Amino acid sequence: SADPERYYKVKLFDDERFERKSCATCKRFYWTIDENRVNCPDHSDDTYSFIGNPPTAKRFDYTQAWKEVESFFVKNGHTSVNRYPVVCRWRDDLYFTIASIVDFQRVMGSKVVFEFPANPLVVPQTCLRFKDLENVGVTGRHFSSFCMIGQHSIPNSNGYWKDECVDLDYRLLTEQFGVDKKEVVFVEDVWEGGGSFGSSLEFFVKGLELGNAVFTEFQGDLSNYKTLDQQIIDMGAGLERFAWLTMGTPTAYDCCFGPITNNLLQQAGIDTNDELLVTYFTKIAKHLEQFSDLSEVRKNAIKSAGLSDEQINKIITPLEGIYLIVDHIRTLIFAISDGALPSNVGGGYNLRIMLR
């Protein structure tokens, strides 16, 4: 953040009187209109307070949330395109599609070229990631597959650059979803991937990161780079998190898999307690920012929530298993239907682990 005027300042921040602040705890820079805020979203007292108390004016389930996002961007000049396969056949260096921008990246030698079917566009891209498999089912927010809302633009006569991107994302939250303006916080960052990178603004509500607007303009890495011939807007947001924010359920799994998990809970004879789950998973979310060891996160959340051994064994542990099973089944369905198979080699090994 050595040059915030060059990399992070956008017109919206002047129009809405956002102030740039440094987090009192971690020193990260962020933008807010809340004059009383002293910490970034990761270290605020209201972190994950939307659980049990959603801050949006409307309630949308998983499907409805996408329809709201899609209608907003289409209304604002974007073309909605269908998702690409989760099996990334157009990239030799990737087994699976890990982000929406991957749909449009073409690697030619040492150069990355972007091919957009429309400009600007929005895409509901299913992505597969296996880095945090041990967290799935336990944390309330980790998935092995998820839908990334991709907002992409090339800043030419048809598209746009930073100012309009951030303005659209802000209006999506405040107008389409009814979030109070004071709840929206933008955090400065840099995003690197696929051989290109740029400054980025992550946007949060109640401590939940909903999306990350990346202003891709460099090729290489932070130690050795050059300017790209083509600038790219690469905003990726989690659809699951948008639905979760509006529903305020104990976990993101509840609003994404609700009818399925409810049926499995009934079949298993598990009687859940919403008040208990809201308390427990709020503690889990907060402790994730403090501890890197998942077992420590879980142990501290159990202690903070005051759970008994009986509640852990009869409610929490079985519930974690159901969440994991439903998540893994969804991932396998996407992967197999798009042409991948569980195996002992390559990306198929990840699927084999999940199936087992």
Where are these regions (language model features)?
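Short, intrinsically disordered linker segments that flank or connect zinc-binding domains
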Residues: 2-16
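Short, acidic/polar N-cap/turn motifs at the starts of alpha helices
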Residues: 18-20, 200
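Residues immediately within or flanking Cys/His clusters that coordinate Zn2+
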Residues: 20-23, 27, 36-37
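Cysteine-rich micro-motifs
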Residues: 33-47
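Structured aminoacyl-transfer and RNA-binding surfaces used for tRNA recognition/handling
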Residues: 50-352
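Aromatic-lined, polymer-binding surfaces characteristic
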Residues: 355
